[in-house]
Amino acid sequence: MQTFNADIAIIGAGGAGLRAAIAAAEANPQLKIALISKVYPMRSHTVAAEGGSAAVTQAHDSYDFHFNDTVSGGDWLCEQDVVDYFVEHCPTEMTQLELWGCPWSRKEDGSVNVRRFGGMKIERTWFAADKTGFHMLHTLFQTSLKYPQIQRFDEHFVLDILVDEGHARGVVAINMMEGTKVQIRANAVIMATGGAGRVYRFNTNGGIVTGDGMGIALRHGVPLRDMEFVQYHPTGLPGSGILMTEGCRGEGGILVNKDGYRYLQDYGLGPETPLGKPENKYMELGPRDKVSQAFWHEWRAGRTIKTHRGDVVHLDLRHLGAKKLHERLPFICELAKAYVGVDPVNEPIPVRPTAHYTMGGIETNQRTETRIKGLFAVGECSSVGLHGANRLGSNSLAELVVFGRLAGEEAVRRAQEATPANASALDAQTRDIEDNLKKLMNQKGSENWAQIRDEMGEAMEEGCGIYRTPELMQKTIDKLTELKERFKHVEIKDTSSVFNTDLLYKIELGFGLDVAECMAHSAFNRKESRGAHQRLDEGCTERDDVNFLKHTLAFYNPEGAPRLEYSDVKITKSAPAKRVYGGEATAQDKQNKEKANG
């Protein structure tokens, strides 16, 4: 067992983790920062984000507009003080990224270009062609290399955190390259481990997005908040989970059913907009939850297109022309050709909704700290209260840098004021973690982790998908209970120590099962329809602000189902109202202007 001493340990080296590391290094250059990642940083899932990052930049836009779009898009389950902080700090972070070298796309006059994104009243999504996540991550990674106090632990798998008298004090990890164990002591720990999309069978997430950080925090008594809200992205490639960015629709792409009809006009997002002239909050630029739900209704009505990869609709970009597609969406053209054999210049792309984003996560306060002193969470693994019941596209990349910076600065404050830890207590915890690992390694049985993982994914798709019924949710809950019992009998066939993926996948599955249970139980007990959580049973098809304008808190229960509690939503200036888009939104805006003008 190797021991390293640091001041701050950051788990995850994607956009949020790197931004936190840079912020901490700048806030106090004397502190040592351990940056721990399962993969080389440029392989983090942030790299897969294509569309863009939101920030007010145009004269006719405002923080209030961005606030209102976010709160309405989240179906009023957002913490409104958090949203205020977020929208006010987005422009600063986008500008900072540019100063560090992020190549934002430009207009002809040299100003930053912005594109339309779903649910946004005004175009405010900064982008770097259709590889925004890649360029942001590359910029952050390059910048982090300037700080010698940031020590990277690439290809290290975190098993658990160390907690002494209610204060986070470090982590224990496996060095995958050598097969050795590592204890990293610190006075503050930041979780930046990404979401949990891999608990679903079909998803847009990278293989490392398995809910590890959520599972670790959960087992230490930190609740997972609002886990029932899982976003389906409307335009994933069938079978692969590869995403066709929302930027396709922001540039003017359209969705049509088997009859070539732009069906979104029938679901509160119309009237139909002119071809190639997208309008904010209309049609294809509605919020993701509503666009995905429209697909489900078209499928039920028999108006989707049958393919060997399942039912799809068509994303048609042909009217945009080859020049625009190759300038603005070059990567999309490559992906469509590679994965479905379609050239978007000449043919429509088959797409269907795919599990994409976890709105819920590790509960934090507005400063990103959890209930454990010195333990912070940021990015998709966290629930700071920004996204509510449905995230707006391009708010997540901005969240990484806005709250990544905040988490880094707050961790510095905690690390500086910390008193010395009890070293013997940390060593005792480390031995317990090693003992638990040996038990996992030596477990005997006939079960296979891959089979259990596949069954978990299928169960989550069936019971916790776009639309939900109590019968199917209960079926999923029962299945997860069965799978957790079978998990106790998973035998590891690989006894080697170096890159033992058999062992690591088993550990990931254990975290995933815990997280999936929180999702399923939270969904079953939210007896209303809000945002990405939509129920079909009588009495639960509408939003219920009287009983469920509340956050769900799921607590770990080692003996069985998670224990659920509820907490109030912080509302500062936007009272819950009907979500409106398309022509109804335009009419509402007109009414509001008339009232304001007397």
UniProtKB/Swiss-Prot annotation:
Catalytic residues (positions): H233, R249
Gene Ontology molecular function: electron transfer activity; flavin adenine dinucleotide binding; succinate dehydrogenase (quinone) activity
Gene Ontology CC: plasma membrane
Start and end residues of each stretch annotated as Disordered: 577-598
UniProt GO BP: anaerobic respiration; electron transport chain; fermentation
Keywords, in A-Z order: Cell inner membrane, Cell membrane, Electron transport, FAD, Flavoprotein, Membrane, Nucleotide-binding, Oxidoreductase, Transport
Topological category with respect to the lipid bilayer: Peripheral membrane protein
EC class of the enzyme, as a word: oxidoreductase
Annotated cofactor note: Binds 1 FAD covalently per subunit.
Reaction(s) this enzyme catalyzes, per UniProt: a quinone + succinate = fumarate + a quinol; a menaquinone + succinate = a menaquinol + fumarate
Binding site for FAD: 12-16, 36-38, 44-52, 156-158, 212, 356-357, 380, 391-397
Modified residues (Tele-8alpha-FAD histidine): H45
Chain's role: Two distinct, membrane-bound, FAD-containing enzymes are responsible for the catalysis of fumarate and succinate interconversion; the fumarate reductase is used in anaerobic growth, and the succinate dehydrogenase is used in aerobic growth.
Family as reported in the entry's similarity comment: Belongs to the FAD-dependent oxidoreductase 2 family. FRD/SDH subfamily.
PANTHER family, per the entry: FUMARATE REDUCTASE FLAVOPROTEIN SUBUNIT, SUCCINATE DEHYDROGENASE 2 FLAVOPROTEIN SUBUNIT
UniProt protein name: Fumarate reductase flavoprotein subunit
Organism: Proteus vulgaris
Lineage of the species this protein comes from: Bacteria, Pseudomonadati, Pseudomonadota, Gammaproteobacteria, Enterobacterales
